[in-house]
Amino acid sequence: MKIYLVGGAVRDSLLNLPIKDKDYLVVGATPEQMLQLGYRQVGKDFPVFLHPKNQQEYALARTERKIGLGYGGFSCHASPDVTLEQDLLRRDLTINAIAQDEKGNLYDPFNGIEDINARLLRHVSDAFVEDPLRVLRVARFAARFHALGFHIAAETLALMRQISASDELNALTAERVWQEVDKSLGGPHPEVFFEVLHQCGALEVLFPEIFALFGVPQPEKWHPEIDTGVHTLMVLAQAALLTEDKSVRFAALVHDLGKALSPKEHLPKHHGHGQKGLPLIKALCTRLRVPNETRDLALLVSDQHQNVHQAFELRAETIVKIFDKADFWRKPERLTQLILACTADMRGRTGFENNLYPQGEYLTQCFLAANNVDIAAIIAAGFQGAEIKQALNLRRIEAVSQFKQKMQTKLPTDER
């Protein structure tokens, strides 16, 4: 019985990155032996055990055989006869197929260390194509290690295209797809995740609403990058620079879905695209089972981002209506999220990356003025029932109007 540290912990150690989780591989043992040593079995499909003291995962060496569609369509064989190399052979990438024994010796049968040094994401074997989830995993690794200079091997990208052209991606559950998206949205370069999916053909299969944006033109005056798909990923990249909030990043990703529905005869203009995109966002979120709060923010950003861009031109009454519709009175954090997403939208254009976004501070001050209206004073003045709401609305409009009069700075309207 031999125990090895495997997977991400070994890889991240070689990259001098912090190690989050440690996974161990046990060669030459049976489930009965593990139980006798005090380990607790938790794996249903294959033998995985928790250490009796530190609760870390220890998996018995196994091989896998493809028997059906999807990432779950495998038959696993765990036995004391399965060797270290046989277990490592079933892994996705060479950089994840390195083992370290208890004395610190490294075992690298597939040249993962060489690929780490070359900053290369390369598949271990042609069995890579048997698991469609690996398309998403490789895209996530490409995004995660983008700043370190990693790129996908041409032959691996070819296999990812092969998977995308088959029916395998459709066998992935919504939960697994969203899990990979969620992890990528939390990383430093989520835009790379979607760029890779676009390159290998998976974006069209899994995210057709986003894929449809590529090739759709925008006015060059406001969008020198022209292509809406390119703009979308630029906005996502800017959102990642502005905030770690994954809901804001997702909202940035889907804020322009409605532009794919603009009539061709009207291009490159996209009148009302924010509202046109709402059904698309709802459908995408339902399909992927996106959390409700994330979905609701995405809908808000799509619906209101054009108004936010034109904030200096809006009447006080319109501004208060926006605050009412978004229920910022009870959820003021949503205003901050909306402004962050709109700032990313403004900066996600060629040549605009470092521009200021005064609309954000302007709307924040408008909200503070409106929210400062004293409801108790309205009630004390004798208003009752529906009159209270009407009086509150009028006083909020007046508060915003007075603030607007103090403002001197005006920006030209952006038709984005």
UniProtKB/Swiss-Prot annotation:
InterPro entries linked to this entry: CCA_bact, HD/PDEase_dom, HD_domain, NT_sf, PolA_pol_head_dom, PolyA_RNA-bd, tRNA_CCA-adding_enzyme
Cofactor: Mg(2+); Ni(2+)
Taxonomic superkingdom: Bacteria
Gene3D superfamilies: Beta Polymerase, domain 2, cca-adding enzyme, domain 2
Catalytic activity: a tRNA precursor + 2 CTP + ATP = a tRNA with a 3' CCA end + 3 diphosphate; a tRNA with a 3' CCA end + 2 CTP + ATP = a tRNA with a 3' CCACCA end + 3 diphosphate
Ranges where the HD domain occurs: 228-329
Subunit: Monomer. Can also form homodimers and oligomers.
Protein name in the entry: Multifunctional CCA protein
Gene: cca
